[in-house]
Amino acid sequence: MAELACFVSFSLTEDKVVWYPINKKAVQTMLCAKVEKDQRSNYYDTILYGVAPPPEFRNRFKTNERYGLDYESDQYTELVNLLADTLNMVSMPTEKFQFDIVKTVVQVRHLENLLCRIKDVNDILNANVKLRVKAVMIACNLVNETETTPLTESNDIVYQDSYFTITKLDYSNHKLLPLMADEYKITINTKTDIPDRNQTAFAAYIRYNFNKFAAISHGKRHWRLVLHSQLMSHAERLDRKIKSDKKHGRQFSYDDGDMAFVHPGWKTCIGQLCGGTTFEVAKTSLYSIKPSKTVRTATNKIESDLISMVGN
């Protein structure tokens, strides 16, 4: 994660906001600049290379001493150009602009995956500019829009039916913020009501074929399959988000779609956290609640059907 200001700067014209990509030499200059404490929240003028991110975000960038955004990579240049182009297409009126927008935390790995989708000539994001803009705005947390399958970050599809798609998330080859993680993302194909029987069938499929994984939600109507061993760390992260929003007077919104496949322990734990229960108490729910009898029965049917097929 990193703030929008780590990638783009802006200027206010008479009628609209104009966005500009930040170049890697500007970042490098900012990282070695001595800046007064009361000026660190402002964009930094490098004199030679244009505007750099506010020095208060210097810790977001990779150096010899710390892990962070690899601003010297080609992907950084591609991403800043994509963000500037996208934001300029949105055409934000000057009178509606608020400086805090540049402090919005964007999903860096999500955005780098979108770069891969956009480069894929067979992917709809390669040619559909309108869809591309919406997908980028979702990744930047700048719109309250459901991340449906056409808008999702990965196009490595491992399962699909009429309602759901599962894509594999691979961050290991990323240049900006590489991460070794075994995860998948679940998205709905269209915004429509999904019959209970289809939810149950999908929940059973996940439980049988992804039995090392748990389906979780961060409350935005898309879901992740994460290893059971990672449940606690994901819950801790969401707990920090809830506390941060409360501290800064923001309303934390959580919507997992009430889907049958969401891990019941996760659903209970997050529900308790949203209700004010401490993490120490809520975390005990993560591994103590079993799937519903309906889902267990549907899973057993998959197994028995497969055994019958082998027998024949």
From Swiss-Prot:
GO terms for molecular function: ATP binding; metal ion binding; nucleoside diphosphate kinase activity; ribonucleoside triphosphate phosphatase activity; RNA binding. It is found in: Host cytoplasm. Keywords: ATP-binding, Host cytoplasm, Hydrolase, Magnesium, Metal-binding, Nucleotide-binding, RNA-binding. ATP binds at Q107, V108, R109, K185, H218, G219, K220, R224. Homooctamer. Interacts with VP1; this interaction is weak. Interacts with NSP5; this interaction leads to up-regulation of NSP5 phosphorylation and formation of viral factories. Interacts with host DCP1A, DCP1B, DDX6, EDC4 and EIF2S1/eIF2-alpha; these interactions are probably part of the sequestration of some host SGs and PBs proteins in viral factories. The active site is at H222. Changing K185A: Loss of NTPase activity and dsRNA synthesis. No effect on octamerization. Residues 202-238 are annotated as: RNA-binding. This is Non-structural protein 2. One of its GO terms (cellular component) is host cell cytoplasm. Belongs to the rotavirus NSP2 family. It holds the Pfam family Rota_NS35_C. It comes from Rotavirus C (isolate RVC/Human/United Kingdom/Bristol/1989) (RV-C). Its main location: host cell. One of its GO terms (biological process) is viral genome replication. The keyword Magnesium applies. Participates in replication and packaging of the viral genome. Plays a crucial role, together with NSP5, in the formation of virus factories (viroplasms), which are large inclusions in the host cytoplasm where replication intermediates are assembled and viral RNA replication takes place. Displays ssRNA binding, NTPase, RNA triphosphatase (RTPase) and ATP-independent helix-unwinding activities. The unwinding activity may prepare and organize plus-strand RNAs for packaging and replication by removing interfering secondary structures. Gene3D superfamilies: Rotavirus NSP2 fragment, C-terminal domain, Rotavirus NSP2 fragment, N-terminal domain. Its cofactor is Mg(2+). It is an enzyme of class 3 (hydrolase). It comes from the Viruses. Its EC number is 3.6.4.-. SUPFAM superfamilies: Rotavirus NSP2 fragment, C-terminal domain, Rotavirus NSP2 fragment, N-terminal domain.
